[in-house]
Regions:
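Zinc-dependent metallopeptidase catalytic helix centered on the HExxH motif
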Residues: 268-330, 388, 402
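Acidic/His/Gly-enriched intrinsically disordered linker/tail segments
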Residues: 278, 302, 308-374, 378, ...
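Solvent-exposed alpha-helical segments and adjacent loops
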Residues: 521-672
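Hydrophobic helix-coil surface modules that form long, contiguous segments used
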Residues: 53, 148-285, 313-316
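Glycine/proline-rich low-complexity spacer/linker segments in large multi-domain proteins
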Residues: 112-157, 511-532
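Beta-strand-rich binding/interaction modules
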Residues: 76-80, 417-418, 431-506
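A surface-exposed beta-strand-loop module
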Residues: 71-128, 487-499
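Amphipathic alpha-helical substructures
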Residues: 361-451
């Protein structure tokens, strides 16, 4: 199954849209225990965008008939059996067939050939879902280049590929070369078969019996070595943590489209993405881990996609934990939920299939990883890690649903487990916890602390285990307590030898909950996630500037669906129920609201800003300032005059949603 990298850009997983298409076309998928086998002979003719395939399929013996789907550009022949065309998809891309009168041994041969045009369905990076031209071949499950048989969704395969001599071919399975052909043998059940290739330079080394590869368009040995070493390190890490790496190979493959895709045993990274210095220690481990979660244990989507949250927790959260930054990572996860999914915009975690907008990301990633963090805290590291290994041993190359993975990690009794999944998988919303009345009294030589804790969300109480931190006079380190709360209000008492002087509830953000406004510093995400974003364009903007601001508004409308662009002369004041962006240095409203954009660390003047005592002039810098007061409706200023810089803001700012102030070198387009 294809994955999109989330650790850098939080990309949308359009592989799942293919899955939904399959489900619609086949009406119902019988998740059969039977695994079919494809013996594929593939010839590629890239200059003609053409391919031919011989597929010797082994179906279960005594199979009378089978329905399958293939792309409509292929001409298909099925010697010795009856082949019937049943129809095609609404867009004409796919054709549905039935084969009848199958031999008793279940062996069927299909011969097909045709063109692969690159003007088909586009992914989120502008990359077609099927490509075969003089530079690239990319074929996956959504390409329907291998018959999709509705009764047998998983397969093993052996594939022999003939391609131009200067091409390298990548797929799943053990790789070998015979004469001018490349052979792939995949013994483990797969949900789809990939065929990727082009005029690559191949770099390889072996690590603990796993063949590591890097495929680049140019012979950049230093870049290849960095990815080979990082791949070895992370495969060792996760193998020790979970169980042996499930494939014989792992490859990092350069792509001419700027993708961040992850497939079984390889990842497809854009030519610019692959050269970003942080990718080997952020995106790469995320994609490697997906070979266990999602491409090693498959996802039963009927009760939600657990893979994204578990992968984010064991890769991105783990990396931050190693650097002592895990509490802030969790705070940002909770902040994302509040910004984009709170106030009735979320849905049950059991209904999450893939990320398609900010709200689905906040549920399927942020809420999900917090669930796994709470499970780990509930039972402790040892039980959590034992559960992870047991889950892997039980379900590898089989589908598992969300309750399955929770059950493997849950340390309590069955009744508690059922209540847990009901609370976190099927309920929408989040707990809202707060301190109530707090008193300290002295009894004999002890101090008795009485703490009221409330759940303020609408609806019934959650069952929670909440950390409580108590600072005592004379103690440098606070005392850590655990509060078990299953009512909307409860009073807890504690006895100490020293006087309590301060308390903090969930100080390290260990509980999935709504953040208090004081825990949410000003950030771009608060504007992006508002019910409405009002973008105020300066009346005096030039034609080119106005065009650029309109393109920014259009791009953000596509992302957030809540954008309204207005002229400054149409604004008598700022709305109290919307986030407002003041656009451009010459904005007529800027002077009027200048004070709201000024604080002890940022000062705004006519053609410059000062951030942490560093003056940034408008002619050389593009800046973003926010009103730091979260008690008011969000207000932001984008200081940009150059149309190129404005379009840079359109692209870059959505990736900085946790930031509260930004400055860029306008000409270099780099963050300062």
């Amino acid at each position: 199954m294809m994955r999109l990298d989330q650790s850098m850009f939080w990309f949308a997983h359009y592989r799942y849209s293919w899955l939904f298409l399959i489900l619609v076309l086949t009406a119902s998928v019988n998740v059969s225990a039977e695994i079919i086998h494809h013996e594929l002979q593939v010839k590629l003719y890239p200059q003609q965008s053409r391919m031919s395939v011989i597929d010797d399929m082994q179906l279960p013996a005594e199979t009378d008939s089978a329905d399958f789907t293939l792309r409509s550009s292929f001409t298909v022949v099925a010697p010795g059996v009856e082949l019937i065309v049943r129809g095609q998809s609404a867009d004409g891309r796919l054709r549905h067939y039935q084969i009848n009168r199958l031999p008793a041994d279940g062996k069927v041969q299909l011969l097909y050939e045709g063109n692969i045009l690159s003007d088909s369905v586009q992914g989120p990076f502008g990359m077609p879902d099927s490509v075969l031209d003089g530079d690239t071949v990319y074929l996956g499950g959504g390409s329907y280049w291998v018959p999709r048989i509705e009764d047998f969704p998983r397969c093993r395969f052996r594939m022999i590929v003939s391609a131009p001599l200067d091409w390298e071919i990548i797929s799943q399975g053990m790789r070998s070369v015979q004469d001018d052909a490349v052979i792939f043998d995949m013994a483990h059940p797969q949900e789809e078969i990939y065929l990727v290739g082009g005029p690559y330079k191949r770099f390889a080394q072996t690590h603990d019996s796993v063949e590591l590869e890097v495929y680049l368009y140019e012979g950049d040995t230093e870049l290849a070595t960095s990815y080979l070493q990082a791949s070895a390190n992370y495969i060792s890490l996760y193998s020790d943590w979970i169980g042996a790496y499930p494939y014989t190979r792992f490859a990092v493959v350069e792509n001419r489209w700027q993708t961040g895709y992850g497939m079984p045993s390889f990842t497809l990274l854009g030519s610019r993405v692959i050269r970003l210095p942080f990718i080997p220690d952020t995106s790469l481990p995320h994609e490697i881990l997906h070979n266990w979660w999602g491409n090693g244990v498959y996802i039963d989507f009927s009760k939600g996609n657990w893979s994204e949250g578990l992968t984010a927790y064991m890769s991105d959260h783990y990396s931050n934990e190693q650097q002592g930054k895990d509490a802030e990572y969790r705070r940002k996860a909770l902040e994302r939920y509040v910004n984009f999914a709170a106030e009735g915009r979320d849905f049950a975690l059991a209904d999450f299939s893939s990320r398609h907008d900010e709200a689905s990301q906040a549920v399927g990633y942020s809420k999900s990883l917090m669930l796994f963090h709470m499970l780990r805290r509930f039972g402790g590291d040892e039980l959590f890690n034992q559960g992870i290994r047991h889950f892997w041993q039980q379900y590898q190359f089989r589908p598992a649903d969300f309750p399955d993975v929770i059950k493997a990690l849950f340390p309590g009794a069955d009744a508690e487990y059922k209540a847990y999944i009901e609370q976190w998988l099927y309920r929408t919303g989040a707990p809202e916890i707060a301190l109530g009345e707090v008193t300290v009294s002295k009894i004999n030589n002890d101090y008795v602390l009485s703490v009221e804790i409330r759940q303020q969300q609408k609806g019934p109480a959650y069952t929670l285990r909440i950390p409580l931190e108590v600072s005592l006079e004379g103690n440098q380190q606070p005392v850590r307590e655990q509060v078990d709360l299953s009512a909307k209000r409860k009073v807890h008492t504690y006895r100490y030898n020293q006087r309590p002087r301060a308390i903090r509830l969930d100080p390290e953000y260990d509980v999935f909950r709504l953040l208090d406004p004081l825990e949410r510093p000003a950030s771009l995400g608060r504007l992006f996630g508002a019910k409405q974003q009002v973008l105020v364009m300066p009346q005096g903007a030039s034609k080119d500037q106005r065009k650029a601001w309109r393109e920014l508004a259009a791009a953000w409308t596509g992302l957030y669906k809540n954008v309204r662009l207005v002229d400054s002369n149409d604004m008598n004041g700022l709305p109290e129920d919307a986030a407002v962006w003041l656009l451009g240095w010459q904005n007529e409203l800027l002077e009027r609201f200048q004070q709201r954009l000024t604080s002890s660390t940022q000062q705004l003047s006519a053609r410059a800003v000062t951030i942490n005592n560093q003056r940034l002039a408008a002619d050389r810098h593009t800046v973003v300032l926010l009103d730091p007061d979260n008690s008011r409706a969000p207000l932001a200023f984008i200081g940009a005059d150059d149309p190129v810089a404005i379009l840079m803001m359109a692209r870059k700012l959505p990736h900085y949603s946790s930031y509260g102030v930004l400055a860029f070198d306008t000409h270099q387009q780099e963050n300062i």
